[in-house]
Amino acid sequence: MREGTPRVRIEVNKGSNRPSQFVSESEEQRLQRVQSRDSDTATMNFVTDDRMMEEHDEYSAFKEAYEEEESREYVIENGVKRLVNQHYDSRGYSSAGRGQKGRREEERRRNMAVDYSSQDFRQSLAAIDQASRDGAISRGEDGVRVRQIGDTTIMTEHRDPYSFYWQLDQARREAESPPRRPPPTDYVIDEEEEVLETVYSPEADDVMFENQYRRPVRHPLPPPPPIMEEEPKDLPPGWEKHEDPQGYSYYWHVDSGTIQRQPPPPVNRETQADAPPPQIIQLPPQQPVIEEHAFKQTTTKRRIEQDEMSEREIEDVAMIENGDTYHKPVRFAVRSLGWTDISEDELTAEKSSRAVNRAIVDLTTRSDIDSIPKWGDGRELIMELDDNELALLDPDSMNVIHSERIQAIRVWGVGRDNGRDFAYVSRDRGTRRFMCHVFRCDTSAKTIANTLRDICKRLMLHRRPSSLHAIESGEKRIVRSEGLTAPIDEPRKVIRCHFLGVTQVPKATGIEILNEAVDRLVSQVRSERWILADVSIAPSTIAIVEVNGQQIAECRVRYLSFLGIGRDVKHCAFIMQTSSESFMCYVFHVEPNAAAMAKMVEAACKLRYQKVLDAHSSSRHHSGMSIHGQHPPSTYHGKGWTETFRDAFGSVTSRMVPSRSAQRL
C-alpha cells in the first residue's frame, strides 16, 4: 500500500461479530455491494494512514521495551532486588519516558475527530447510528461526513476541509442535488406606480406591428343621450308652466288649482279646430292675478249661491223627475262604543258641536268602558246607510241589530281628537230622550259623515218642487222636515302661501306676543323647510292643506283670539285658543304681502260674528215676526251672511296695499 493512500475500516454486523479488516480503497465498492446484499447493518469508519503508521510504531516500541525488560538480570543485595543499569516498569519505559509518551498520546487523542479507545467506542457507535437513522448529512463544520447506501452507513472523517474527499463530495453534490429554492421574501409595495399606456395609432410610421404583450385597452362607450321628455309646445287651456326654487318645472291648472310634474296631455287638434275661438274676458280690477317667480298665486272667488245647485244635485233632480230615487246602500265596518243621553237644550246650533264632542270624549276615555252597554256587545258590526234608514248589521248572520230612520237623526259629527270616531244623535223610541251613539270606524269617519250629508241632500231635493208649474202657481208651501235642515256648503276662499309652522304662546292676544312667535319660527325654520300649502278660509273653519298632499291643520274660527301681520309685511299669523290655558300661533309667509290673507281671515271672523247675531235675533223675535208676517231684521242692512261674505271678499282686492296699521285688527 502506498504512503498517503487512505485505508478503510469496515465493521459488519449480521447475526455475529466479525473482526475489523483493513482493505484498500479499490475494494470499497465491491464491499459496499456485498454488504448491501448480505448484511443487515454495516458501519464503516474511514481513518487516515499517518495515524495507522504512528500506532504501529508505538506498538513496536512497546514490544521492544517489554522484551528488553524480560532479558535483563537483577542483583539482590541484602534482600533487595536492584537493577544494574536503569529501572523500567512493567510497560517497559521509564517515568520520564512515560510522561512524554502520555502527553503525546493526549495530544493525539485531542487531534482526533473520533475517539477509538475502548471507553468511548460504544458512545461513538451510538452517535453514528443516531446520525444514520436521522439521515443527517454533515455540512463540513465537524469534519465528518455520513452517508446511507442501502443498509450500510458510511462515515468519512477528514481534518482538512480542502482534502480530496471533501472536494469530491462538493462536486458530486452540485451535480446531483436539486436546485435550492430561494428563501421566501416579503415584498412590500409602498406605492404602486401607474404604467402609462401607449396607444399606437394605425397612422403612426414608427409602429408597423401590434404588440401582443401590451395590456388591452377598453375604450368606454359614449354615454347614452339623455331622455328628453317632449314638452308640449301649446299647453291646454287653463294650464301654465312654472319653475320651483330648485329649478324644476311644474304645471299648474288655474281653475282647479291642480299642480303636477308631468305635462298635461295635449288637446285633440280636431276637437280644438271645431271648437269656437275662446272669448277673452278681462278680469275686473277687483280680481287681480298675482304672478311670482317661485310660484304663482291667484286669488279666485267661487260664486256660491244658496239656491245654486251643484252638478250632483242636478243629477239627483233629474233622477227624481224620472222617478228613479233608489241608491245602493253604503256599508262601513264600525264598532259600537256605547251611547249617552243629551239634553235637548244642547242641540242648538251653538252648542251641538261641543255637546257631541264631549259625548265622544266621555265614551272613549272612560275607565269602566267594559260595563257600558254597546250595540253587538262591542263586536265589529256593519253600518249600512241608504235613503231611508241607518242600520247596524251582524256580519255573521246579517241580521239587523239596530236601525234609525234618517229623518230621526238630529245631529252627527266626527271626533276632534280621533278622526275615526263617529257619532249621531237621535231620539230614543222608548224613553223619548235624545241619545248620542258613538262608533269607532275602521276608516276615516268623515266618509260616513259625508255619505249621510249626501243622503240628506237627496231627501231635501225630493221634497223641493221640481217643476216651474209649482213655482208659478204662487202657492207657497212650507215643508216642515221634522228638525232636518238643508245642509249648505260654506263659501271658501283659497290662497296659496308657505306655512312656517305652529308654536305655543303665553297669551291669547297682543301684537308683541305675535311678533315674538313669528320671529322665533323664522329664525328656527329654514326657508327650504317651509311647506307650500293652500289655506282655505271659510266663515267657520280655516283649513291648511299641503299642495297635492294631506291636510296639515284645521282651525275653528270661533276659537281665533288674535290676528296680525309681523314686522315683515310678508308674514301673517293668528293665535288659536286650544284650551283654557293653551294658545297656539300659526305663522305663514305670503307673496307679495300678507294683506290679502289678513283681510280674508278678518272677513271670516266678522261673518262668524254676524251669523251668531242673526241666530240670536231670529230666535228672540221669532214669535213677534210670525204674527206680523215680517222678515227678521239683519244687522248688515238687510243682507244675509252669504251676501255679506261675498261683498267682504270682493272688497279685499281693493285694499291690497299693505299698511303697518293692519298689524292689529
Curated annotation (Swiss-Prot):
Gene3D superfamilies: 2.20.70.10, Pleckstrin-homology domain (PH domain)/Phosphotyrosine-binding domain (PTB)
Organism, as annotated: Caenorhabditis elegans
Summary of subunit composition and partner proteins: Interacts (via PID 2 domain) with apl-1 (via cytoplasmic domain).
An annotated GO cellular component: cytoplasm
Keywords: Cytoplasm, Cytoskeleton, Repeat, Transcription, Transcription regulation
PANTHER family in the cross-refs: AMYLOID BETA A4 PRECURSOR PROTEIN-BINDING FAMILY B, PROTEIN FE65 HOMOLOG
Name assigned to this protein: Protein Fe65 homolog
GO BP annotation list: embryo development ending in birth or egg hatching; feeding behavior; nematode larval development; regulation of DNA-templated transcription
Keyword Metal-binding applies: no
Intracellular or extracellular location(s): Cytoplasm; Cytoplasm, Cytoskeleton
Region (Disordered): 1-43, 90-111
